[in-house]
């Protein structure tokens, strides 16, 4: 049940420090008298209702447990008309604490001879509407903390009003209980039983304090009220519906030293470890936390109006509504986490508090506090941790170096461990049903058994074969081992030139769909096809060197000399043994290279033959010219070429001219032969040879230059 304040967003309690000055709100006498009259009227109405029901023998209507009519002034808690404390279970917190020896929120006592404590139904709960003065600072007495005075229309009176109520106030309930005769004894017994159950050691001291306060009660009501504040039960309405109590400095000390007080879900989620481990391991550091948090509390209490913006900042950072108590708990928990930074850290909480630092700095500028709240938090972080890496961490998160100049005067260590997230170690697990397993090698016996099972059952029932085979082998493993290793249809080793030519044709047809390529080849697997294709492409991209050409030609000449069939598969293996290149040559590439080398040799031979023909033709022309120029003594004295006609000197001149004209028109090579030779050499892609016209003598009809005419 959350307390709702109509006039402000201030939570149920302000927390004051030891240095704050006591200030009490002033009320007029008329207001005090009005409140007294209202209380008397309420009591009279209650008595009339009880008498009316008693005469009519009608059971009284059940009043809401939280209604103001059931407030017993003598006890200060909800009770019945028999002066027996009737405390509903919803009012008790989840845990009890030991503050100054008095249980502030005691657990329900074991009333064996009294009425049974019952829970009130949800529809009967009516929470009193509480109001609080926004401008009144918290009340402090003798350096001890106390909650702010509350004004209420339901029976909770203010401090000044309590001083004038003849010791019938709710705040003096414990002292007045000790004055009554029978009722006091019952309550003493009940409280002593509760204290023994809850192990409260300072029970007797508290009773003595109560008696001393009761003796001085009639003399000075104001002092009595202030002294009884040490034992008052302060009701703080939590979000869960239970009421928790805090009064003294020990309250804050216990609040900030134990995570058990994190009754709210928001604060308990921020606790990483149990409260016991914190208290046992870091008992010495709790005092440092309390000391470091007091200046922060002092500044909040001394600055009027700053509580609401601070709570708003906390609610914005944590994205939830928060009270002052929860705010201080979060600050203390953060300091604990900083202490435990060497062991464990929660990054989410650090981000929250660094956002808070930035916003609180702007708030200090608005209230002209010179960043005092901001600086005190930074000082507390650095001093408690005492490490250089904490200073670096603060700088990385937006805190300036000027704000950390005080660290130069502090001796800092460098022992804290860096915040490192451990990488998850990935483990390889079984591949059965989608999970990877360790490698399961095949033995010779398993391979032989697989061959037998395949011959018996065929190459399709792999699950059946795997179950019969055993050894942890799956159906997929059996199928792959059969198709890639044991099948007699699959070839192993290097490819010949015919297979490689077929491979390139099928790749042009199907692309890189290796299953379809392997289906058409039938003698190679898809993996073999893929490997051979890329190997051939990489081999073609590298140029041949002279050493490789020599090895290739020597190997082929040896094969021809031994009358062996030329196998380029063996030639490629021979080249691979030489290790002239990183990538071995394929059989098809060796074949294409040999054809290239052979064609160049043929072209060179043709070139040599052509040169011999041209030289012979030039020699014949020279012989013809020599026969024409030199005269012969007799026709049989010198050999006469067949192309030269026999000329008689006794022939008439006209016949000689006709013979000379016929002789000039004769050519050594016909035109058709020249065209055929030119076409032959032009058709060759490697070397082209053109017949020069200069090698063919062409004779023109010139009478002046004719040697026969000169005779």
UniProtKB/Swiss-Prot annotation:
The keyword Transcription applies. It is found in: Nucleus. Disruption phenotype: Cells display an aggregate-less phenotype. Residues 462-486, 514-538 bind DNA. Residues 428-490, 491-542 form the HTH myb-type domain. Residues 540-598 form the Myb-like domain. Keywords: Activator, Developmental protein, DNA-binding, Nucleus, Repeat, Transcription, Transcription regulation. Residues 113-139, 148-157 have a biased composition (Polar residues). GO terms for molecular function: DNA binding; DNA-binding transcription factor activity, RNA polymerase II-specific; RNA polymerase II cis-regulatory region sequence-specific DNA binding. Transcriptional activator that initiates multicellular development by induction of adenylyl cyclase expression. This is Myb-like protein B. It comes from Dictyostelium discoideum (Social amoeba).
């Amino acid at each position: 049940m959350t307390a709702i304040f109509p006039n402000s967003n201030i939570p149920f309690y302000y927390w004051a420090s030891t240095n704050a000055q006591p200030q009490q709100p002033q009320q007029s006498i008329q207001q005090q008298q009005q409140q007294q009259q209202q209380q008397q009227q309420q009591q009279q109405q209650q008595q009339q209702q009880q008498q009316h029901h008693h005469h009519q023998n009608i059971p009284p209507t059940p009043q809401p447990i939280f209604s103001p009519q059931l407030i017993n002034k003598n006890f200060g808690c909800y009770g019945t008309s028999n002066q027996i404390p009737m405390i509903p279970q919803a009012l008790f917190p989840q845990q009890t604490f030991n503050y100054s020896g008095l249980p502030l929120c005691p657990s329900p006592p074991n009333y064996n001879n009294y009425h049974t404590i019952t829970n009130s139904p949800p529809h009967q709960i009516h929470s009193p509407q509480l109001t609080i003065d926004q401008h009144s600072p918290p009340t402090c007495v003798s350096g001890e903390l106390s909650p702010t005075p509350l004004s209420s229309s339901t029976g909770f009176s203010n401090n000044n009003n309590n001083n004038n109520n003849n010791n019938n106030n709710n705040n003096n309930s414990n002292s007045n209980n000790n004055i009554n005769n029978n009722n006091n004894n019952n309550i003493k017994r009940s409280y002593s039983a509760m204290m023994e159950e809850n192990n409260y050691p300072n029970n007797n001291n508290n009773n003595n304090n109560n008696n001393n306060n009761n003796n001085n009660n009639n003399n000075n009501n104001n002092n009595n009220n202030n002294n009884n504040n040490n034992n008052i039960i302060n009701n703080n309405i939590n979000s869960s519906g239970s009421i928790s109590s805090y009064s003294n400095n020990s309250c804050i000390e216990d609040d900030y030293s134990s995570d058990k007080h994190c009754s709210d879900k928001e604060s308990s989620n921020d606790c990483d470890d149990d409260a016991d481990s914190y208290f046992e391991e870091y008992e010495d550091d709790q005092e440092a936390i309390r000391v470091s948090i007091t200046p922060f509390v002092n500044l909040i209490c001394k600055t009027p109006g700053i509580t609401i913006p601070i709570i708003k900042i906390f609610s914005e950072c944590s994205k939830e509504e928060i009270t002052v108590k929860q705010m201080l708990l979060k600050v203390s928990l953060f300091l604990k986490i900083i202490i435990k930074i060497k062991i464990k850290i929660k990054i989410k909480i650090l981000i929250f508090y660094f956002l808070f630092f930035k916003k609180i700095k702007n708030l200090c500028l608005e209230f002209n506090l010179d960043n005092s709240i901001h600086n005190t938090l930074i000082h507390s972080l650095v001093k408690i941790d005492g490490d250089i890496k904490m200073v670096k961490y603060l700088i990385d998160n937006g805190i300036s170096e000027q704000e950390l100049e005080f660290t130069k005067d502090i001796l800092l260590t460098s022992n804290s461990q860096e915040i490192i997230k451990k990488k998850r170690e990935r483990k390889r697990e079984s591949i059965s049903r989608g999970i990877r397993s360790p490698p399961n090698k095949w033995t010779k016996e398993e391979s032989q058994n697989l061959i037998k099972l395949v011959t018996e059952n065929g190459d399709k029932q792999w699950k059946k074969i795997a179950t019969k085979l055993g050894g942890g082998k799956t159906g997929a493993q059996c199928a792959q081992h059969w198709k890639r290793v044991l099948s007699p249809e699959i070839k192993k080793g290097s490819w010949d030139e015919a297979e490689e030519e077929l491979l390139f044709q099928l790749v042009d047809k199907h692309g890189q769909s290796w299953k379809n390529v392997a289906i058409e080849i039938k003698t190679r697997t898809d993996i073999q096809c893929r490997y051979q294709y890329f190997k051939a492409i990489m081999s073609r991209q590298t140029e041949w060197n002279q050493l490789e050409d020599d090895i290739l030609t020597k190997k082929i000449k040896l094969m021809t000399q031994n009358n062996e069939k030329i196998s380029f598969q063996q030639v490629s293996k021979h080249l691979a043994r030489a290790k002239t290149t990183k990538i071995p040559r394929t059989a098809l590439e060796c074949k294409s290279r040999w054809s290239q080398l052979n064609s160049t040799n043929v072209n060179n031979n043709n070139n040599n033959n052509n040169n011999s023909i041209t030289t012979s033709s030039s020699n014949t022309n020279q012989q013809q010219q020599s026969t024409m120029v030199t005269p012969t003594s007799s026709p049989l004295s010198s050999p006469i070429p067949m192309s030269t006609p026999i000329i008689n000197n006794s022939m008439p001149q006209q016949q000689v001219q006709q013979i000379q004209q016929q002789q000039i028109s004769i050519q050594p090579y016909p035109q058709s032969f020249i065209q055929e030779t030119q076409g032959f050499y032009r058709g060759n892609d490697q070397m082209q040879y053109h017949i020069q016209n200069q090698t063919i003598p062409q004779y023109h009809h010139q009478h002046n230059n004719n040697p026969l005419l000169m005779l």
